[in-house]
Amino acid sequence: MQLENKVAIVTGAARGLGRAYAEALAAEGAAVIAADLNDCNDTVAAITTAGGRAVATQVDVADSQSCDAMASLALDAFGRVDILINNAALYAGLKGARFEQLDETQWDKVMQVNIKGTWLTSRAVVGAMRSGGDGGSIINIASLAAVFGLPYGLDYVASKAAVIGMTRGMARELGPDHIRVNAVAPSAVMTEGTEEFFGEKFEKAKTVIAANQLIPRNLETEDLTGTIIYLASDASRFVTGQTHMVDGGSWFL
C-alpha cells in the first residue's frame, strides 16, 4: 500500500469524484476524513466495509471556523494530517450564460467556494503538516476549463484558473516545509454533477467531448484516482507546483 500510516482529508467527499478519491486513498492505506457540506456517511460506510479507516464531518469550506474544526477533527481522530484533496467546488447546478449576463450572486458564491474555500482549507491544515515533520501533499482540483476556456461559464473558468495560480504560489511558499502543492485539471467526468451541469444536453455533450480528445472516449473516475494516488504518495516526492492535465489529450487538439 502506497499510503499506509498517512492521513488524508478529502473535501466534497459525499458523492462523485470526491467520494471516489476518498475510497481510492483508503484502499491504499490512508485514514480518511470525508468532509462535505452534505452527509458523508455513505462514503465512510463504503470505506469501512472494505476494511479501511474513515470518519465523516460536515464542512463549509467558505467558512474559516468550519475548516479549522475539520482540521481539529482529523488530529483528534488520527493524530496527524498528511494529505489534503481540495475537491469541494460549485459546478453542478450553475446557470450558464454569456459572461455579460452571468448572475452576480452566483459569481460571488462560486468565488467564495472555489477560491476562498481552497485557501481556507489549506490554511487550516498546513500547521498540522508542518508539525508532523514529514511534510505533506496538497492536491487542488482545477479543471481543463481553466486553460481551455469554457464558454458560458466564466465564473467557473475564472475560479479554476485562480486555483492553478494558487497552486503555484503555495508551492513556492511551502516548499521549504517539504509540503508539496499540485493541481489536477481534468476534462469533464461523466458524474451526476456533470449531468446536472449539462442538463438535457448531457448525452450530446458526452459525444462531443469524446470526439474532441486524442483518446476518443469519456473520462472515467478511475482515470483520475491514479493521478491522485501518485500525487499523494512518495512516488511524487520531488514534484510540486505542477498542474497535471488528465484530459485524454484534448488540450492538444
Residue ranges with predicted function:
Residues E28-D42:
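Conserved glycine-rich Rossmann-like NAD(P)H-binding loop of the short-chain dehydrogenase/reductase
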Residues C67, K95-F99, D103-D108, A205, ...:
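Substrate-binding pocket helix/loop in short-chain dehydrogenase/reductase
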Residues Y91, K95-G96, F148, I229, ...:
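Short C-terminal tail/terminal secondary-structure segment
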Residues S122, S159, T167:
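Active-site helix of classical SDR
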Residues G127, R172-P176, R237:
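Alpha-helical segment proximal to the catalytic Tyr-Lys
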Residues S143:
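Residue(s) in the substrate-gating loop at a strand-loop-helix junction
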Residues P176, A188-N212:
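A glycine/serine/threonine-rich, flexible loop-to-helix segment
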